[in-house]
UniProtKB/Swiss-Prot annotation:
This is Chromodomain-helicase-DNA-binding protein 3. The lineage of its organism: Eukaryota, Metazoa, Ecdysozoa, Arthropoda, Hexapoda. ATP-dependent chromatin-remodeling factor which acts in nucleosome-remodeling by catalyzing ATP-dependent nucleosome mobilization. Likely to be involved in the regulation of transcription. Disulfide bonds: none annotated. It comes from Drosophila melanogaster. It catalyses: ATP + H2O = ADP + phosphate + H(+). A motif (DEAH box) lies at residues 409-412.
Amino acid sequence: MSSKRGADPDWKTPGKASKDKRPKTNAKKQKFRDEEYCKVCSDGGDLLCCDSCPSVYHRTCLSPPLKSIPKGDWICPRCIPLPGKAEKILSWRWALDRSVELRTSKGEKRREYFIKWHGMSYWHCEWIPEGQMLLHHASMVASFQRRSDMEEPSLEELDDQDGNLHERFYRYGIKPEWLLVQRVINHSEEPNGGTMYLVKWRELSYNDSSWERESDSIPGLNQAIALYKKLRSSNKGRQRDRPAPTIDLNKKYEDQPVFLKEAGLKLHPFQIEGVSWLRYSWGQGIPTILADEMGLGKTIQTVVFLYSLFKEGHCRGPFLISVPLSTLTNWERELELWAPELYCVTYVGGKTARAVIRKHEISFEEVTTKTMRENQTQYKFNVMLTSYEFISVDAAFLGCIDWAALVVDEAHRLRSNQSKFFRILSKYRIGYKLLLTGTPLQNNLEELFHLLNFLSSGKFNDLQTFQAEFTDVSKEEQVKRLHEILEPHMLRRLKADVLKSMPPKSEFIVRVELSSMQKKFYKHILTKNFKALNQKGGGRVCSLLNIMMDLRKCCNHPYLFPSAAEEATISPSGLYEMSSLTKASGKLDLLSKMLKQLKADNHRVLLFSQMTKMLNVLEHFLEGEGYQYDRIDGSIKGDLRQKAIDRFNDPVSEHFVFLLSTRAGGLGINLATADTVIIFDSDWNPHNDVQAFSRAHRMGQKKKVMIYRFVTHNSVEERIMQVAKHKMMLTHLVVRPGMGGMTTNFSKDELEDILRFGTEDLFKDGKSEAIHYDDKAVADLLDRTNRGIEEKESWANEYLSSFKVASYATKEDHEEHDDYNNDAENTDPFYWENLMGKSQPKLPKKQKKQSQQSQVDVESIMGKGKRIRKEIDYSNQYPSPNRATPSSIVLM
């Protein structure tokens, strides 16, 4: 038999029309169109020709082999149409024997790719031969191969047909949640009489929703379909069958609400009282601020309050809840646990996802902004959960809805009536407003007024009159008057008042010495800024702030200066050399000793810094020491943040340290599994530090919490705390107009005083007595029988305790003494000249050269001193220094 195709005149390629029916081509083109040899074995003979490509095959070379010649059109395995458009390649493996991919007579292995299809759920992922993928998605395959090891698959080949979800899906990067039905959001009738259901999957965006058939073998789908049908049925009869309210809103809950008892859930007594107060306020039409201290469950109280309105027939919504993006997941969990019958829609995601929500989740009927404005829409959902950003971005749509209630979590976003969030949200149509904040009086009286103005613009509409009425809130009559105004609108309780059985906390200031390297840098920062410091009449405030910021960096670690980091010794692993890294900073040296003991005693640590670059240095340190850790800062968003929290809180977690930036670590984070808090550098704003240690000292904590605040001895850090704390304690209530905000309230004299603090000892030739932490000192420091002043509330809470309204009495002030000297450290106008000018007499040439070389050595690390540049106002990046002070401290 001839090796050429068609040698046998009686054998014709099945399914092919005669050659004369093919498009006529010249011989040269025909050569490239039809192959002459089997695609598999490269031999000739009786060959089967594909109707879709030029390839030809022996029947026996196909896998599985063809027993007979197929009738009609036939296409080879390579050309079999794909089930859909490939979205991405998840993994690859060597083809198994049962594959329909081609085998070679030489036994060569063929690859298969695990494909996620566009518009289809992960349940429909399947293995596709490499040949098919190369034909239809060559660029996708090439991209996958570039970033993957294609020599051997990362996972062992196993049988995936046994129904084992791990072997079929999880091992290839598919999360279990992506296979769980969250809810059915719509349906569509098929022409053949069947029904398709649009399914929203857990932890996936709405644009990942997919159409599924009821007959599909997907766990939980039938139950979700039943709930969907029940919701549609109840929605249709909602207006005509609305039941009368079962419980009077003015009646206070004396026990757990019935719907919580039935679910086996239980509130604390103070939370029951909070829910009752919210219900009463709703009934009276009084907008409110729930200002409980952080960690007392404002989220849960709010959810139960809304659920009580729903369950008792007072209101079915719609309720709008606006929260930080980082807390969305936590709100979803609490709503699902405490209010399972509320239909909650999380309105986040890209344009496509939000379009899906608007189309399928707003109503069972077709909706338009016109019908919503005219209040003709029967809403499908009860609660819409969204972030601040989408309140503004989609105001044209969301602003058309008549909201029964608005809840704003972390309501300090409304402290300025000039903010976009404030202005846009004020235009929404809202029946009742509830603001949640743990720090209602964070800065000044003006910010409090703006919160009240947002709640009730008709009642609180004149800022000047409000400020004039409360010019001095330290006076008893003005405090009393302020209480009368706030009483209907605000409720605040403290942990010390309502959680008597909660483990105590002890906070300590830990004074730390500068290392020799830090002292050299500290001196250089001062000397290179001699001209700015020595200006008669005082330097510019902005210049002094810049100097202070450089000194604060120096107090943390010299490696925060780029040139110093570049000169640092790097280990083969790419990390800083550990000994040099640790010894360069007095704080890090002490931290190293503390962590060793804390790890040995099975404690877990939250480590805060307000500088994200310092967190980078701490990461190098933790990796070098071999400690497992998690990290959250402002760049880590959404579900990644929640995953880190869940990972750390896992009962079997090996993670020892949680790194947090002070600002990012204060919102919606529960880390009560940690019992030690170390504040590496204090924030300007004391509320942020209070929020920081409240991550651990909150409901759910079972151990005493130890809080250590590092402060560099005889430095700007120490003086800032003394000056700021004294100013805040003098005012008692930080609500005086003009205080706080983003501009500093430190005068030039105070700034100069802060910069001078400790410099005499620094520039002395002799050695002063230094604080040293040996093993015994560290053990004493970590002794958990030590007591701070936890029986006192922090000053930050003392001033807020004056605003405990409803039936909550004001606590008496605690007398407190500190080392602050009311007089400036040194008011000599020639101070810097005397310190640095006269202390550097004219030197002989040889000594002068050595001195200059020494200066060059420092400059090679830090830079060549002050250059002409635009002044940078660091007060735009850091809160005002006048707000920085520790709470409940013991000086070590």
